[in-house]
């Protein structure tokens, strides 16, 4: 089960002339395609919906929402998730990122992000079982393992 944070979902709208951004976008599109084909399971959350609604461009909002169409479930905010997020926030994770982590912990195998600061900070916290990874690296490792 895969949880993409909002940075991943917004990546297709970033400057594709930048090689890194282009590669990350292709990885994210591949992951979404494989979820749509049923090879992997995509997760959505109330936190993602809230963050997407804050996007000023309505067309972008609609497109991002469509990217989440293959999601098999929407993770609801609960007191447990909010308390877990507060713990992550106390460890230096930003509020929305902490909520994404807390949503993903009980439901996902991996949380993917292109936010380098969040990725580094989340990987440094060893009090949770969740794998937080970069989509390009994760896709490469996962496909390599699958085809080996």
Regions found by a protein language model. Give the residues of each.
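PIN/NYN-family metal-dependent endoribonuclease catalytic core
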Residues: 3-56, 69, 74, 136-143
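Short, aromatic/basic amphipathic alpha-helical patches
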Residues: 58-66, 120-126
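Short beta-strand scaffold positions
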Residues: 4, 76, 95-98, 113
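Helix-adjacent hinge/juxtasegments
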Residues: 61-85
